[in-house]
A protein has these predicted regions:
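Short beta-strand/loop segment that forms part of the nucleotide-sugar
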Residues: 38-47, 66-67
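Glycine-rich, basic loop-to-helix element that forms the pyrophosphate-binding segment
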Residues: 67-84
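Short aromatic/hydrophobic "clamp" motif used to bind/position activated sugar donors
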Residues: 89
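Conserved donor NDP-sugar-binding/catalytic core segment of glycosyltransferases
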Residues: 101-134
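N-proximal low-complexity "stem/linker" segments adjacent to membrane-targeting elements
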Residues: 1-32
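Acidic metal-phosphate-binding loop of nucleotide-sugar-dependent transferases
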Residues: 71, 96-98, 124-126
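Acidic helix N-cap motif at the loop->helix transition within catalytic regions
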Residues: 22-25, 50-58
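A conserved acidic beta->alpha catalytic loop
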Residues: 45-54, 93
Length: 135
């Protein structure tokens, strides 16, 4: 990755959603509570018919909301990429969350440490109502 000013990095988090009123509060809260300050959180919604957009509007940290029909999750992700202004782009689905408030800080730290780093990923914890699965 060729970033000129690594001391002033901004990260864009793209959340794509459609009729996500049951889960999106947790997602939005996990981004809002991150300790890293330079976050551009974009919501790309597939024209939800439930309360998703009204819930999103309650979160002042969200920088942009697009709500229009799309051709599926990858079309929505590409819409987000086109308008992203961060040095780093990440995705957080509307039914996912960051496990703690340092996740984005740790990601940015890794990009600052390694000038050749182009991408990173984390372990996943799959949760159902009974068990947790680490991958």
């Amino acid at each position: 990755m060729n970033i000129k000013n690594k001391d002033n990095l901004k990260i864009t988090i793209i959340t794509v959603c459609y009729n996500s009123e049951k889960t999106i509060k947790t997602t939005l809260g996990s981004v809002a509570n991150q300790t890293f300050e330079k976050i551009e959180h974009l919501i790309i919604d597939g024209k939800s018919t439930d309360k998703t957009i009204s819930i999103v509007k309650e979160y002042s940290h969200v920088k942009k909301i697009i709500s229009e029909p799309d051709k599926g999750i990858y079309d929505a992700m590409n819409k987000g990429i086109k308008i992203a202004s961060g040095d780093i782009i990440g995705f957080l689905n509307s039914d996912d969350l960051y496990i703690n408030n340092e996740v984005i800080s740790k990601v940015v730290s890794e990009f600052k440490k390694d000038p050749l780093l182009d991408a990173c990923y984390a372990d996943l914890i799959y949760v159902n109502h009974v068990t947790y699965h680490f991958h």
